[in-house]
Amino acid sequence: MRVIQTAGKRKTAVARATIREGKGRVRINHKPVEIIEPEIARFTIMEPLILAGEEIVSRVDIDVKVEGGGFMGQAEAARVAIARALVEWTNDMNLKEKFMKYDRTMLVGDSRRTEPHKPNRSTKGPRAKRQKSYR
């Protein structure tokens, strides 16, 4: 039995996806993807599944474990992990091209991270300054 593991990151969230032969079940942290709330996060996670098509998704089971970050960061990390898993499972360049054309970050990831706080007014953020008055 073939098993493939992939990972996806977004901000501080890390998702690890395991894909194997099955009946089309997709689970995020042991929950079926259909009951993930909020709805926007569910749709984000399902993007690669919809793009790949029913004939590919119905033949595999995907388990994703996500930790860290907020709900949207977790959803986008899961989306990256699922997309990478599907491309690796099918070895299909057309699918990879379809994902890249739709949204490049689905396979490549988003390298943006939060800027570290600077020492001036550390609790306020990286660029916060005291307000300056001229009169």
Curated annotation (Swiss-Prot):
PANTHER family recorded: RIBOSOMAL PROTEIN S16, RIBOSOMAL PROTEIN S9
GO terms, biological process: maturation of SSU-rRNA from tricistronic rRNA transcript (SSU-rRNA, 5.8S rRNA, LSU-rRNA); translation
Biased composition (Basic residues): 119-135
Ranges where the record places region Disordered: 108-135
NCBIfam families: PRK00474.1, uS9_arch
Pfam families found in the cross-reference section: Ribosomal_S9
Gene Ontology MF, one: structural constituent of ribosome
Family listed: Belongs to the universal ribosomal protein uS9 family.
This protein's name: Small ribosomal subunit protein uS9
HAMAP family, A to Z: Ribosomal_uS9_A
Subunit field text: Part of the 30S ribosomal subunit.
Cellular component, GO, one term: cytosolic small ribosomal subunit
Keywords for this protein: Ribonucleoprotein, Ribosomal protein
Keyword Transferase recorded: no
Biased composition (Basic and acidic residues): 108-118
